[in-house]
């Protein structure tokens, strides 16, 4: 029993009833098509040629329609071009004519309506006959091409009453899209024969070689409103109402695209582009918009407030020694930045400042981990470490090299600091449990918008003397190089001569990233971490007595800050300045990561100290809670995660190679640093400039694709505008070009005073007065002819002669009045050298102070 084919409806289309044909339906459709084609060939007879002048006796212009409108003249071009001429055309020519007249809609490789040669030629013959027949209707018949299309699609032969044949069709689309035009299209019967595959003679929807995704892709950008328009409705109708009322409310629309005309009005270019000239005001505006709390930040007197205000702190087992403090640190002044980027002044290691830093960095050790079997679990973690990261064959064939040469390099490096082979102590006679302590005078830039409520606390350094570090550093350096040589290919440690962040043949795009942020990393380490390091060092080949010795004096230690007079005992936490700091932090991070995540799911793994970054094709799977419950770490999985490690973004160029780019936000903050010492010849400023150039050597590799990547990563990480990052790159390009451009960012108050006091006018006169008195100022006695260095003037040959105020030794018999008069007369005004008006600029007048004379204006 044959069931009728399902009718076309939205419900049948959604539930899959429509469009699924059985083999019986396919055979029935093919037989019907064969019968229609045979009938068309049998019934077709070419019409006899008709002379237009004989068949139409009346004048074309005199022929009137019932409504009084003149009839449209018939074009001879289409009348004389009979249907028999189309029978002689090739298939390609017929396809061109079909596209010209019917204008089918192309969907992928399909046409709607489909091309049928017999139906197309029959439509042409019928259209020719209709144009020659007398007109009895008051409606305007379509032109020849539109009439052929109407006959072929079985639609209306006449134009609608609203628009005539010679009028321009109106765009009835609800959206004004340049280049697109939407024309009304009458409804058809809805039946279209399915396309047949030429290869397997099956319906194309059921053919295995039919690419349905290719059919969906060109239609993905089309919307519901492009195919249908609303008729006769008042108000806004939602999509649900439209879908439930398709029939009575909607009219099909035919969409076609034409080339957009060239605009006659040119759009003015945007003046705020990254390629425009960069000035200091633009860089400051970038800082103000990106770092809103940093632009008004000034900590010139913050430490004064700390020292003078009431202070309360809670520490256990702290020892204070206030008898031999260093009250003042000699300082010759620093360069003043023009940019205000929130950088702080250098911190002085006073007692209160050191106690505040110890409270944050060393005291209050968190206790987040659970109770575990330390010996058993530490061995398991070390075993997982070697399985995940180490190539066993390379480790077995590798050994220690360059230990002695590393020791010699270390001694040569610190030779200028007074370190020599004769000063090396006997380690067995030294108490290695005592560490020196200090705070970093330079505070790390803050990228969060919290400077208005939070004062950054400086970091601390716990270290041994250079004479002790020099005997452990060569061993750990050689061991670290061996460790790098034995790593698997996908593991990268971006430090040293062997490895870096440059990865050839690896693209960071289209990959999942995993970045773990470990807070309070140094002071959170305990005995469990120390045992893990001991097992790993023994496995890497470090001599067991040295490993045992090193771990023993890290179990309990005592730190002391001699400058601040503060001492405090500490236990297992990391010593931030000894020979094993970076190596130890790196292997601890790698061991924790291997226990929490399966390293085989990552294509690349990067580790550096407490920083880690992984790349994978699929979302990483692991348990990050073990960082807290097992390792006593405050861990945070960065979301959204971007390729960022060691304060650098990782970008890929067009060739699939990855390189590192320093964080633009931190580099802009470094442009406003206040730690550059002042010097007359700008040697310290030039050294800082060379460091800036070395960090930004990546600028030559930045293409537009890399700039777009950096903007996206910058916006994802900081939730700030990515366009600001592109503007920062323009500023970096300017200030790395030459040293003169970089000098615009800094000035000195000394130079300002020098420019104020350096002037030359022809009306200025100098009167010399003999004076042989001694001068005294700030408790230092000098003669007037004593030599001392003075800042160089702004004129060639102009040296300022600055004299010190001296005062003769007073006796008990002199009165106070005579002392004031003598002191007043001995004071002189410092004046610059005045050029003689009758000599050239190369000659100069000898300063009067060098002759032992006073100067008076």
Swiss-Prot record:
Catalytic reactions of this protein: RNA(n) + a ribonucleoside 5'-triphosphate = RNA(n+1) + diphosphate
Biased composition (Polar residues): 804-816, 824-840
Annotated GO biological process: DNA-templated transcription; positive stranded viral RNA replication
Keywords associated with the record: Nucleotide-binding, Nucleotidyltransferase, RNA-directed RNA polymerase, Transferase, Viral RNA replication
MF (Gene Ontology): nucleotide binding; RNA binding; RNA-directed RNA polymerase activity
Signal sequence segment: none
Annotated Pfam families: RdRP_2
All copies of domain RdRp catalytic, residue ranges: 511-624
Disordered: annotated segments: 775-857
Record text on subunit structure and interactions: Interacts with replication protein 1a.
Protein name: RNA-directed RNA polymerase 2a
Organism: Cucumber mosaic virus (strain B)
Taxonomic lineage of the native organism: Viruses, Riboviria, Orthornavirae, Kitrinoviricota, Alsuviricetes
């Amino acid at each position: 029993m044959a069931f009728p084919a399902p009718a076309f409806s939205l419900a049948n289309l959604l539930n899959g009833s429509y469009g699924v044909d059985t083999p019986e339906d396919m055979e029935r459709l093919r037989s019907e098509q064969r019968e229609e084609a045979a009938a068309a060939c049998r019934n077709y007879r070419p019409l006899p040629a008709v002379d237009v002048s004989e068949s139409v006796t009346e004048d074309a212009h005199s022929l009137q329609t019932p409504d009084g409108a003149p009839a449209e003249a018939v074009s001879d071009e289409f009348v004389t071009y009979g249907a028999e001429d189309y029978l002689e055309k090739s298939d390609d020519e017929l396809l061109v004519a079909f596209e010209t007249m019917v204008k089918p809609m192309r969907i992928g490789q399909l046409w709607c309506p489909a091309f049928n040669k017999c139906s197309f030629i029959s439509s042409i013959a019928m259209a020719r006959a209709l144009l020659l027949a007398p007109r009895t209707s008051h409606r305007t018949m379509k032109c020849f091409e539109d009439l052929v299309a109407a006959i072929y699609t079985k639609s209306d032969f006449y134009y609608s009453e609203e628009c005539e044949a010679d009028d321009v069709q109106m765009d009835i689309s609800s959206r004004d899209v340049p280049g697109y035009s939407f024309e009304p299209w009458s409804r058809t019967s809805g039946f279209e024969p399915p396309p047949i595959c030429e290869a397997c003679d099956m319906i194309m929807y059921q053919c295995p070689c039919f690419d349905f995704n290719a059919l969906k892709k060109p239609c993905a950008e089309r919307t519901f409103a492009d195919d249908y328009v609303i008729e006769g409705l008042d108000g806004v109708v939602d999509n649900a109402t439209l879908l439930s009322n398709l029939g009575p409310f909607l009219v099909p629309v035919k969409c076609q695209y034409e080339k957009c005309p060239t605009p006659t009005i040119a759009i003015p270019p945007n003046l705020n582009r990254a390629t425009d000239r960069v000035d200091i005001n633009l860089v400051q505006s970038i800082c103000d918009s990106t770092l809103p709390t940093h632009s008004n930040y000034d900590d010139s007197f913050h430490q004064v407030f700390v020292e003078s205000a009431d202070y309360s702190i809670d520490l256990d087992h702290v020892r204070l020694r206030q008898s031999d403090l260093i009250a003042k640190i000699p300082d010759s002044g620093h360069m003043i930045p023009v940019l205000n980027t929130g950088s702080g002044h250098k911190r002085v290691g006073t007692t209160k400042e050191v106690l505040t830093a110890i409270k944050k960095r060393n005291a209050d050790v968190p206790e987040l981990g659970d109770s575990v079997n330390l010996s058993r679990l530490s061995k398991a973690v070390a075993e997982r470490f070697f399985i995940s990261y180490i190539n066993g064959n390379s480790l077995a064939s590798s050994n220690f090299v360059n230990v002695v040469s590393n020791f010699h390099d270390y001694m040569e490096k610190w030779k200028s600091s007074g370190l020599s082979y004769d000063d090396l102590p006997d380690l067995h006679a030294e108490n290695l449990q005592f560490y020196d302590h200090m705070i970093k005078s330079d505070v790390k830039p803050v990228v969060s918008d919290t400077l208005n409520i939070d004062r950054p606390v400086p970091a601390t350094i716990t270290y041994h003397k250079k004479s002790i570090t020099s005997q452990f550093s060569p061993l750990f350096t050689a061991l670290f190089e061996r460790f790098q040589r034995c790593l698997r290919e996908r593991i990268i440690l971006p430090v040293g001569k062997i490895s870096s962040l440059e990865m050839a043949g690896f693209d960071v795009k289209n990959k999942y990233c995993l970045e773990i942020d470990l807070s309070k990393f140094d002071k959170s380490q305990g005995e469990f971490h120390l045992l893990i390091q001991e097992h790993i060092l023994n496995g890497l080949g470090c001599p067991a007595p040295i490993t045992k010795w090193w771990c023993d004096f890290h179990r309990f230690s005592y730190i002391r800050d001699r400058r601040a007079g503060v001492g405090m005992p500490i236990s297992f936490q990391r010593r931030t300045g000894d020979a094993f700091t970076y190596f130890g932090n790196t292997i601890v991070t790698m061991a924790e990561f291997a226990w929490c995540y399966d390293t085989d799911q990552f294509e690349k793994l990067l580790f550096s100290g407490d920083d880690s970054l992984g790349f994978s094709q699929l979302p990483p799977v692991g348990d990050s809670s073990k960082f807290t419950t097992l390792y006593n770490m405050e861990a945070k999985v960065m979301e959204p995660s971007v390729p960022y490690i060691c304060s650098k973004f990782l970008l890929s160029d067009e060739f699939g190679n990855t390189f590192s780019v320093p964080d633009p936000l931190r580099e802009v903050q470094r442009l406003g640093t206040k730690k550059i010492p002042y010097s007359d010849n700008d040697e310290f400023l030039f050294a800082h400039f060379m460091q800036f150039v070395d960090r930004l050597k990546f600028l030559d590799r930045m293409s537009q694709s890399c700039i777009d990547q950096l903007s996206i990563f910058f916006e994802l990480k900081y939730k700030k505008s990515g366009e600001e990052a592109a503007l920062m790159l323009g500023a970096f390009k300017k200030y790395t070009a030459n040293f003169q451009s970089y000098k615009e960012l800094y000035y000195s108050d000394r130079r300002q005073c020098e420019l104020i006091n350096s002037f030359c006018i022809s009306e200025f006169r100098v009167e010399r007065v003999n004076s042989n008195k001694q001068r005294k100022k700030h408790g230092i006695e000098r003669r007037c002819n004593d030599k001392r260095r003075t800042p160089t003037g702004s004129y060639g040959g102009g040296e300022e002669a600055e004299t010190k105020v001296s005062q003769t030794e007073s006796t008990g018999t002199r009165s106070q009045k005579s002392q004031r008069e003598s002191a007043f007369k001995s004071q002189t005004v410092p004046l610059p050298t005045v050029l003689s008006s009758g000599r050239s600029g190369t000659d100069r007048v000898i300063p009067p102070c060098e002759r032992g004379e006073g100067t008076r204006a």
